[in-house]
A protein has these predicted regions:
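Low-complexity, proline/glycine-enriched hydrophobic segments characteristic of transmembrane helices
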Residues: 265-326
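Helix-loop junctions at the membrane interface of multi-pass solute transporters
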Residues: 16, 25-32, 58-64, 210-233, ...
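Transmembrane alpha-helical segments of multi-pass small-molecule transport proteins
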Residues: 41, 89-96, 119-144, 161, ...
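Membrane-interface "cap" regions at the ends of multi-pass membrane proteins
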Residues: 1-22, 66, 230-231
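Membrane-interface alpha-helices at helix entry/exit sites of multi-pass transporters
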Residues: 2-3, 33-41, 76-79, 83-92, ...
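Hydrophobic, small-residue-rich membrane helices and short re-entrant helix-turn-helix hairpins
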Residues: 73, 113, 139-156, 176-181, ...
Length: 346
């Protein structure tokens, strides 16, 4: 027996909605300007097609093992291509997936959780790491159905709460919305002088961050899709396509609006804490140089945090590298849920 279609989309969304929805979007705007948001939208429409194909194939070539459905790219590559080539290609994909999903990608997500919790609540990184490992272990040992049940409970809650924050910020800044969308489209095609020189980089960054966020075509989504029990394979393909739209068009756009409406992405011309010096990309990462000369390497999530603070405080707001305000707490909690459920999906 398999999991339900709703559990499959919740599990898939758990994998798609992660640090890329906050840090990735912030980085895209930081490097490519507002126009990068448009190219993330374009990527979502193209990526939905990839998600449909890979998830449908996962359903077609899935296998029942020990009472549960198993499938994914390694399965449909081996059984779809057939012969020695299919076995070799499927094995290579499986090995690469184990390395990336088992070792590399969880490190990105857990590091984001640890950094945000340390910034907001001053919790030592090792305590966060141990907590994540313990909770994760308890859930994983329950099997795929337990993982799906947790994802079903957490994913809708975290996505809706995050989007509601964005909606609230839009409402209190409603007069800026028309100009904001105009800015996105104008800068997307290099029609604004400020962003004309980075037209190519804008597209590249928008596409990269869009794919990093929604994972369409990466081969990570079909595993959850294959575990679902549906009447027709294409139904699960359509459901997974919808999850790409939710990830990029809703959650990523929520982050983009939080940042763009408040204007905190353009720190070279924005309000700064006295003595604070914003820096662009350096060889050793993105950082903000504080008034005392220290450097904060927390990354571009700072712009999402500052976006919430400025939207709530209005004209009295000043960019604060120390992240004092509700923004740091909200983003830390959001990153915890986003990143933790992504690790769970892996």
């Amino acid at each position: 027996t398999g999991i339900s279609s709703f559990q499959a989309i919740a599990l898939s969304l758990a994998g798609r909605v992660g640090t890329g929805n906050i840090v990735g979007v912030s980085t895209a705007i930081f490097i490519g300007g507002p126009g990068a948001v448009f190219w993330m939208w374009v990527t979502a429409f193209l990526g939905a097609s990839s998600a449909f194909i890979e998830s449908t194939l996962g359903q077609i070539f899935k296998r029942e093992e020990k009472g549960e459905y198993r499938g994914g790219p390694a399965y449909y590559i081996e059984y779809g291509i057939k012969g020695r080539l299919g076995k070799i290609y499927g094995l290579v994909f499986a090995i690469v997936t184990v390395i990336s999903v088992g070792l590399l990608l969880p490190g990105v997500q857990s590091n984001a959780i640890a950094s945000s919790m340390n910034n907001a609540f001053q919790i030592p990184n090792w305590i966060v790491a141990v907590t994540i490992a313990v909770i994760l272990g308890l859930i994983i040992f329950g099997g795929v159905k337990w993982i799906a049940n947790v994802a079903t409970a957490v994913v809708p809650f975290m996505a809706i709460l995050y989007i509601l924050m964005a909606v609230f910020i839009i409402i209190i800044n409603i007069q800026a919305v028309p100009a904001l969308f105009g800015l996105i489209f104008k800068s997307a095609f290099g029609m604004q002088a400020a962003f004309g020189g980075i037209f190519g980089a804008m597209i590249e960054i928008g596409v990269k961050r869009g794919l990093y966020s929604n994972e369409a075509g990466q081969g990570t989504g079909p595993h959850a899709a294959s575990a679902a029990e549906v009447s027709h394979p294409a139904k699960q393909g359509l459901v997974q396509s919808f999850s790409v739209y939710v990830d990029t068009l809703f959650v990523c756009t929520a982050t983009a609006l939080i940042i763009l409406i408040s204007g905190t992405y353009n720190t070279t011309n924005g309000d700064l804490k006295p003595g604070g010096i914003p820096e662009l990309i350096k060889d050793n990462g993105i950082y903000v140089q504080n008034a005392d000369g220290t450097k904060d390497y927390s990354g571009t999530a700072m712009y999402a945090q500052a976006g919430i603070d400025k939207a709530l405080q209005g004209g009295s707001y000043h960019f604060d590298p120390a992240f004092s305000g509700i923004g740091s707490y909200f983003i830390a909690i959001a990153l915890f849920f986003f990143a933790f459920t992504t690790i769970l999906a892996y």
